[in-house]
Structure formats: C-alpha cells, structure tokens
Amino acid sequence: VAARVNRILESTRAKRVILIGHGLGGLVARAYVQHCGGVDKVERVVAIGTPNHGTLLARLVPGVGAAQMRVGSRWLQELNQGESWPTEIQYVSIFSRHDNVVIPQASAQLGVAKNVAVKGKGHFGLLFSREVGQLVYREIVEGVQ
C-alpha cells in the first residue's frame, strides 16, 4: 500500500489520498494509517463491509489474512487497541445489517468511525449496490473539498 500511495502522490502531485477498501482491504487501509506511516498521506478511509472487530467465519478459512480477521486475533487486538485513530483523518465504515460474511455484523462498526448502515445487502452485494456507490461517492466528494 505504501509504495502504491507514494507513486500516486508523486504522479498526481496530490498531498493526500482517499483509501477505499472492502473487507480485509479496509483493515489493510487502517493498518497503513495506524502503523505504516500513512497518517500524513491519507485524507480519509472508506471501509466497506470491513470486519473491524473480526468475523466468526474466519475460523473456517486457512491463511494468514483469515487468521488476522478472527475475532480476538492478536493482529486485530493491536489494531483496535484503545480504538486510536488520528483525528485529522476521517474513517467511514459502510456496513450491512445483512452481511453474510462479517458475523456478527456489529463487528464492522468502529467507535472512532462514521458508521453508516445499509440494509438488504450481503457482503459481496455491497460492492454492486447503487446505494453504497452513492455513499462512497459522497465521501470522496467531501474528502476533496
């Protein structure tokens, strides 16, 4: 993420980027801001269907990424420690009350975030939802003003 953000900033001469991530991608964006030097390069993070506090389904999937998304994993505990987040960066969590992957669905909410709930969409349905697209668009527009 860091290398990609640096290339974008260099090529566009922008001062900051807006990161948008779905599922684990939202956690990666958070980790970049909180632990990998992204605080000075990111304007806001828009997370879609991101298991900020883990998902019970991660126990059924092999691999490092799934292990990190397990409820109570050390990686998530470190990421959520004190739910610290730089106040100058807006974190938006768009989540579905009907997410069939982020279980429990409340795991997508974060105390330091602007939490936006939508209904009737599954985890992958969030990606193809006109409503979610409009929410993301609004967050981008707000972020560049």
Regions picked out by a protein language model, each given a short descriptive name:
Residues 1-85, 101-102:
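Serine-dependent carboxylesterase/thioesterase catalytic core
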Residues 85-91, 110-114:
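Short, proline-enriched alpha-helix->beta-strand connector loops that line the catalytic pocket
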Residues 93-95, 99:
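Short beta-strand/loop motif that positions the catalytic acidic residue
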Residues 102-110:
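Short alpha-helix in the alpha/beta-hydrolase fold that links the catalytic acid
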Residues 120-124:
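Histidine-bearing beta->alpha loop at or near hydrolase active sites
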Residues 127-140:
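Post-His helix in hydrolase/transferase enzymes
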Residues 141-145:
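Generic C-terminal helix-cap and adjacent flexible tail
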